[in-house]
């Protein structure tokens, strides 16, 4: 049986840290930025961790499990 392919969309959106947690980027940072404050845009720049309820499905898409 051939190897399972990872989901390309998940591969582009998520990175796994050394401890096994999954990092993601924030949404709402691509356009219509004039009405958003500098503080809000700066906060959206930083990466965040995926919530634990979503970790299992993302790991399946990345073929980690």
Curated annotation (Swiss-Prot):
GO MF term list: structural constituent of ribosome
Similarity section: Belongs to the bacterial ribosomal protein bL35 family.
Keywords in alphabetical order: Ribonucleoprotein, Ribosomal protein
Domain of life: Bacteria
Region Disordered, annotated ranges: 1-22
Gene3D superfamilies, per the entry: 4.10.410.60
GO CC annotation terms, alphabetical: cytosolic large ribosomal subunit
Example of a GO biological process term: translation
Pfam families according to UniProt: Ribosomal_L35p (PF01632)
Protein name: Large ribosomal subunit protein bL35
InterPro entries listed in its UniProt record: Ribosomal_bL35 (IPR001706), Ribosomal_bL35-like (IPR021137), Ribosomal_bL35_CS (IPR018265), Ribosomal_bL35_sf (IPR037229)
């Amino acid at each position: 049986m051939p190897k399972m392919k990872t989901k390309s969309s998940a591969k582009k959106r998520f990175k796994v840290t050394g401890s096994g947690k999954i990092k993601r980027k924030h949404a709402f940072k691509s356009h219509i930025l004039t009405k958003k404050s500098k503080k809000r845009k700066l906060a959206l720049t930083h990466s965040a961790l995926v919530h634990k309820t979503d970790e299992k499905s993302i790991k399946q898409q990345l073929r980690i499990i």
